[in-house]
Amino acid sequence: MESVYLFSSGTLKRKANTICLETESGRKYIPVENVMDIKVFGEVDLNKRFLEFLSQKRIPIHFFNREGYYVGTFYPREYLNSGFLILKQAEHYINQEKRMLIAREIVSRSFQNMVDFLKKRKVRADSLTRYKKKAEEASNVSELMGIEGNAREEYYSMIDSLVSDERFRIEKRTRRPPKNFANTLISFGNSLLYTTVLSLIYQTHLDPRIGYLHETNFRRFSLNLDIAELFKPAVVDRLFLNLVNTRQINEKHFDEISEGLMLNDEGKSLFVKNYEQALRETVFHKKLNRYVSMRSLIKMELHKLEKHLIGEQVFGSEE
């Protein structure tokens, strides 16, 4: 199952058992059988009947604004939610020791994934290894988040050494709005990854509102932000380098906005095409002794967390 991306403006309707997008240029029909979720970037109209159809077919729909920022999600009625597991999620959040175990594991493994990403590209990452040790010694989540933020800034400076075109270097991480080409690409990629993880959470018994590294507060969802941290190097950062160093993306794919930049529709379309390809790419899983897609790896992490919460397996350990 894959994501459907809509950049055109128009009206979304149900036609028989398909999704129909009506635009000035005509109608586009999308069979629902293989749709995991819908990501809307254009200006679309829809009605309650269409949302009922998506709910019946268990398809989340994510909305992004013109600049590519995530706005919100229509999250269908949770058909797999388990009251028992929700209680376990809450218990592991409220109990500081249990929460720290999960949060520390996420940070530690995300650091290791950054190190592996750099080592594959012949970049020394000794300082990140030191941050990993600091994370293991952190006493609370706030301290852990501070360590993670400092490490990621250093990590991005190392990525800059791999960028062939200096105009596309990160220099300093900026957001809302991103100030340069690199930050625009990374922010857009992260937004896509967050919604991908959110849609995959919907296919589990987990509640996306209860996270462990990111605070569970008035933010609608936080668990997807936690799990996405593990996959940013392999998905978003790798894609960023590939698009820039192969010169697939250039200045023509960006528009200036107030105090920053955004990807235009051509740039977004190019990015999501390569993003979906990255999610389909496979890696060899030693334990399973077979190749699995990146999307499948994300879902496997969610199942590991489920098992941890009910006491079947320690999160991060090999099955």
UniProtKB/Swiss-Prot annotation:
GO biological process, one term: maintenance of CRISPR repeat elements
Cofactor(s) in the UniProt record: Mg(2+); Mn(2+)
GO molecular function: DNA binding; DNA endonuclease activity; metal ion binding
Keyword Methyltransferase: no
EC number: 3.1.-.-
NCBIfam families: cas1, cas1_HMARI
Name of the protein: CRISPR-associated endonuclease Cas1
Organism annotation: Thermotoga maritima (strain ATCC 43589 / DSM 3109 / JCM 10099 / NBRC 100826 / MSB8)
GN (gene name): cas1
